[in-house]
Structures are given as C-alpha cells and as structure tokens.
Amino acid sequence: MSFSVSCKTPKTTKLLVSSISESAVALIIITIRILFSIGKSDFKKIISKEINGAETIYYRNIPESKPQGS
C-alpha cells in the first residue's frame, strides 16, 4: 500500500528508507539476543553468519557509521 504513495513524493520515500534502516538495526539486535540466549554452537554459526551479512548490507548503505564492537 505505502509503496504506491512513496513513489509520488520524495519525502515519503525518505521516510520509508529510514524505517527500513531502523528495521535492519532492530533485526540485528534481535538476532544478537537470540545468539546469546541460545547456547547451541550450530545456531551460533548460522546466526553470526546472518549478522555479518546484515551488517555488511547496513554499513554499505550508511558509510558514515562504523561497527562498534564485535
């Protein structure tokens, strides 16, 4: 629904992009919480691979910010 509106006005597009970025950050935080709550090494391998992929995409879109910690 919101995609047809966002194509018409650049302001809405900017809002949409910022909300997607916030969703990406939230997803990373949730994934890290899952990583610490589940102690299984298989899950740790899979989740840390997902986090690395998500961080690569996120930090490519926002070059100013740098990863803090590991």
From Swiss-Prot:
User: What keywords would UniProt list here?
Assistant: Membrane, Transmembrane, Transmembrane helix
> Which topology term describes how it sits in the membrane?
Single-pass membrane protein
Its localization reads:
Membrane
Q: Where are the transmembrane segments?
A: 15-37
Record's GO cellular component, any one? Answer: membrane
Q: What superkingdom heads the lineage?
A: Eukaryota
Q: What is this protein called?
A: Uncharacterized protein YIR021W-A
Origin organism is Saccharomyces cerevisiae (strain ATCC 204508 / S288c) (Baker's yeast)
